Amino acid sequence: QATYHANRMPPLILIALLFLMGFEKAKPTKPISFAVTSTIEVNAPPEIVWQNVVSFSELPPVEDWLFKTGLAYPIRAKINGTGVGAIRHCEFSTGPFVEPITVWNEPSHLRFSVTSMPQPMQEWTFYKHIEPAHLDGYFQTTQGEFRLESIHDGKTRLQGTTWYQNDLAPAHYWKVWSDFLIHRIHLRVLKHVKHLSENQSN
């Protein structure tokens, strides 16, 4: 069962408003940093789970209605090299995240910085290849990590964390929405890693 460190969200209609409203730019101050952590239990040992965290095959088509609104969602991940300095690419529906590895403690801790990220969502428009200014620079992912903990009966507690900066005002209001959306992205990846690992372990 996956867990998330946040309260439940308001009804569907309030969530939909996020995509109908324009983002509000904060005053020119230093963006505030936040972290979101999600956890899932995997019925496989860390040595197997690790391999599916570092890189993973293409995820199944999205079923979550939220991603069908245009929100960027993960598709696959690949890595060039091993150890600190290797470059991981996490492909999203709007483009790749470029993630240089900063911590490589196999099979328990993988951390990476983010040097490039795609747009957070695909704008609803009749025109292709449009990059609206109101999507640029308001939300930046700065780093991420996976922690794998061996627990009872050969299982693994898998924890994913994303650090991000929010340049929207009011920051703590938008944090609620941002955390919710990041958690949904986490769960898409964590559930896929769980599925792959448990199939390999059986």
Where are these regions (language model features)?
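Hydrophobic ligand-binding cavity/cleft-lining segments
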Residues: 3-84, 91-98, 103
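N-proximal short alpha-helices
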Residues: 18-23, 158-162, 166
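Glycine-rich portal/gate segments that line the openings of hydrophobic small-molecule binding cavities
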Residues: 11-12, 41, 70-153, 157, ...
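Soluble extramembrane regions of membrane proteins in the secretory/endomembrane system
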Residues: 159, 175-187, 191-194, 201-202
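Long, contiguous hydrophobic alpha-helical segments, chiefly transmembrane helices and signal peptides
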Residues: 1, 53, 88, 160-164
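Aromatic-acidic/polar surface patches that form glycan- and anion
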Residues: 42, 137, 182, 186
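A short acidic/glycine-rich loop-to-helix N-cap element
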Residues: 132-133, 163-185
